[in-house]
Amino acid sequence: VWVEKIGELRLDTHTYHIGKSPFTARGETSIGYWKEGSVKGVHKDYKVEVSHDPINLWKDGTLRFFGGYQRDYYGYDKSIRSMPYWGAQFRTAVGPRVNAWVSYNQRNINYNNSPYRFDSTELPKELIYGGSFKLTRLDDISVSVKQNMMNGDVDSIYYTYHRDLHSFDMYLTYKDSHKNNNNQWKIKFVGKDF
């Protein structure tokens, strides 16, 4: 089943400090028309997240904790999904061209109420780890592994090529779904400097 996002518009805020404190807030929202087989309709969502300036563990090693709230509105059946979440992320430079990361994410949701199969929250507790290698000043590749913390199984592996296009970033990703046949390619352009 192919998923179509027709005319989706997404806005992400910058990260803003809360007063003069080290705590930060950011948000994002999107609206678009989604179609997956016979399930189709307008989708709207927003997300707010609070965090803090990264804690420097050593020269190139940082730790960050975060928490937030996401809410989705589905025009197909008028359902609403509310999802508080929290997590932690560690990042480090292994060398001048190599970075590594590990993060834990927990989505506090009792059941998935999205009418779209591709939009389901399959892993309420996940560990993501990986690394990237800088090929040139504008290009890098990365591998990221998503592990289900409920049973310990590897859920999927993402192979990504990233290119800095000056005002945009391009990401070409292959998702190896590991245990099922839901492998897929995805290309994404993200505007910056706007």
Give short role names for the model-derived ranges:
Residues 1-194:
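Outer-membrane beta-barrel proteins and related beta-barrel translocases across Gram-negative bacteria
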